[in-house]
Amino acid sequence: MANIYRDRVLNQVTEADIDSTLRVAGWVENIRDHGGVSFIDLRDMYGVLQVVIRDPELLKGIKKEECISVSGIIEKRDEETYNPKIQSGTIELDAKEINVLGQVYTTLPFEVMTSKEVREDVRLKYRYLDLRNQKVKDNILFRSQVISFLRQKMTEMGFVEIQTPILCASSPEGARDYIVPSRKYKGKFYALPQAPQQYKQLLMVSGFDKYFQVAPCFRDEDARADRSPGEFYQLDFEMSFATQEDVFRVGEEVLSATFEKFAPEGFKVTKAPYPIISYKQAMLEFGSDKPDLRNPLRIIDVTDFFQKCTFKPFIGKTVRAIKVHAEMSKGFHEKLLKFATSIGMGGLGYLEVLEDKSYKGPIDKFIPDELKEEFRSLAGLEVGDTIFFMADKEDRAAYYAGMIRTELGEKLDLIEKDAYRFCYVNDFPMFEKDPETKQIGFTHNPFSMPQGGLEALNEKDPLEILAYQYDIVCNGVELSSGAVRNHDMQIMVKAFEIAGYDEEVLKSKFGALYNAFQFGAPPHAGMAPGIDRMIMLLTNEENIREVIAFPMSGTAQDLMCGAPNEVTEQQLREVHIKVRD
């Protein structure tokens, strides 16, 4: 749309405009002086156009990153000066008039074109400059395209987009709440939602069949490379009269469509149906409940076998093993041992299978000769294989094995490249025991339906009860968690009772659900894939903050606007707050 600042955006200026007079606007990306003739690379959100300045008076006082409007005549470039890197690389604008729209008053803190090389805290302080960098900006524009597609896809699948409240009641859902004091009700607080969990379930009780939203979620958690502190966004959806398998099909359809559309060229995407791996199987074979299926290595359990051997460090412990077919130097083993000790292991035993099918390695002498063939069969060993061992308590052995599996996959270059490998992990334990207090608590979402229903809750050991809970994992990154919800009041009361909450606590903490479930709640289920993590994977960024327009720092600070900040004594009094030293 033409106006007083520009006739069109830069990617709309083409060879068809040659000899035309145009006005364009943008930022001064670069200034080059070629002795009597100067050039400006003018940048807007859509592209870059070279501006030729033959009158030095036009350039006087103009600095990099100033916002300017330029009018002039579009010309064909000399063929030897074509720039194939930009869309307008065969044309340029011969400037006749330049107006400064937004002046640069102080020294730039960094070069915009190389801002990704600058320290992160400086980038975040001047994020509005960092976002002028084409790669940084492209991530945010890409995010917009993905979210638009997700909305379109969910709508096509019959889901209705509904916004749920941002100010809600605090409830014990796992992470710490961000709380907001009430001015009107002294001593009472709102909380920012960790997820729209209760509201989306209440929508199902209200008779909405399929709900979704691009939901902001707020959790007072520490940052990680794949977790932004403060807030994040998820594609939250819920379905009435739905089973676990129904949710799986929806998750597969929307994620497959999204990744197939937006994956970099040449990348492979898992076809539906996705593999389904139980939590128990995942912890055994992958040493993690977030298995990376690009890594071909698998972990096996050899605990029972080694209880028949004489190697004391393995006696009475869980023993896991990883078989690898690759040549490894002495230096490789030394580096792997160093890694093993860095994660807390006391050592790293191994065996190599030689040409005559005998073993070489520090553990060989502890395996009786009459058991060696049994072990070869158990582990599926072939000539040229090396098998590594991890032994400890079950949870530590699984952790160590998972870490060694990942290290081997990376260092031996076994990880499948250019691929997005999805799977579901399901059958999570419903309850867990706190190692310090010994109290039974929920492992995951407290609103999940236990497998076996009320009968299981009444008759089984709580630690043996599984829940209809599931995660979607892609390349070792948890994209989503979800569950079949517990919509039966009797089952819910009993489940909370086992976790140490009596019915009165259930009424007070989750009163809306408790009351709503008195009035004919339908069976329902859902999940919520993380949008930030999706885009992080699709852009191949290692840090989630690279795909968020205005992220907090790793220390949960907004370095640009200064949050969290102090407020006035008057503001504190209005909400009945006194800050303690």
Describe each model-derived feature in a short phrase.
Residues 1-581:
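Class II aminoacyl-tRNA synthetase catalytic cores and aaRS-like
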